[in-house]
């Protein structure tokens, strides 16, 4: 299987299946001398790990990461960083009844046709369990980006039909939904409780923001910063759409509204989401991603078996009724990996570029 590596200078390679013995990652290209501890990685892993609230899967995985290489006496050496997370709470028997069936809207059918072999336990390689390694790798990138003045944060901006207005970053880490509006949390909880009673699932919208990014990141034409961000975010399980800045709303905007006018005091708006011509503008980089509702539910759904016979599928096991609830740290990680890669690429080619034009902020 190809396609397990992301990045050009800062690269992340992952391996492992949902019910295998462990997940692993190789993170290559991190500059030497960065102070790095297990706690730096574990902090974000704890934000993503399952079983932390009644609104997520009850699979109990501690997601304790081990650093196998690339760090010595608390600092990165410049060598490849090896990471490992052991799986400890697999219940593979939950999936024995569907080993010859295809769950609707899952990767079972497409993996079967592509490889002729598949690990049906918990989705195998296609499971969102894989994203634990992305979060661990992204934590390394986030730690380095902080030294460059770049902060990446995310939040849930919609759950099902409930839109969540942004009020404050202070509340995002104080609830299971990563909601920036504390007043919305009771409504979100009630909605999820009813959803579970209905034996159904729902999608979500996540917003992720990078602040402190200087102008100049991004390689125009095929490696545009927004194109690579979209690539990274679309690679997350269940993501079906990505917007940068105003996104699809730009269709109804006139040019006089959409253009982000410049003044000596700063930009007057940020419809471009901090990226112009594929290159960072110095404004906050803003991306939104839409995650579909998981089809791993106990309500019967029509499908076929490996012989083409019609069947009804009921998926047992422990599943997230809304995969978006745990997606915020994953989105942050993928944005961090992209920005880290482009920061190193820009440093390699343009480290000596100096212009007299001031860097504008946003009014």
Swiss-Prot record:
UniProt pathway: Metabolic intermediate biosynthesis; chorismate biosynthesis; chorismate from D-erythrose 4-phosphate and phosphoenolpyruvate: step 7/7
Enzyme Commission designation: 4.2.3.5
Reaction(s) catalysed (UniProt annotation): 5-O-(1-carboxyvinyl)-3-phosphoshikimate = chorismate + phosphate
Cofactor dependence: FMNH2
Binding residue positions for NADP(+): 48, 54
Residues reported to bind FMN: 125-127, 237-238, 277, 292-296, 318
Gene Ontology CC: cytosol
Cross-referenced InterPro entries: Chorismate_synth (IPR000453), Chorismate_synth_AroC_sf (IPR035904), Chorismate_synthase_CS (IPR020541)
Keyword Signal applies: no
PROSITE patterns reported for this sequence: CHORISMATE_SYNTHASE_1, CHORISMATE_SYNTHASE_2, CHORISMATE_SYNTHASE_3
Gene3D superfamilies with a match to the protein in the record: Chorismate synthase AroC
Cofactor note (record): Reduced FMN (FMNH(2)).
Entry keywords, A to Z: Amino-acid biosynthesis, Aromatic amino acid biosynthesis, FAD, Flavoprotein, FMN, Lyase, NADP
Enzyme kind, highest EC tier: lyase
Assembly and interaction partners: Homotetramer.
Function description: This reaction introduces a second double bond into the aromatic ring system.
Family named by the database record: Belongs to the chorismate synthase family.
Name of the featured protein: Chorismate synthase
Organism of this sequence: Pseudomonas fluorescens (strain SBW25)
Phylogenetic lineage: Bacteria, Pseudomonadati, Pseudomonadota, Gammaproteobacteria, Pseudomonadales
Underlying gene: aroC
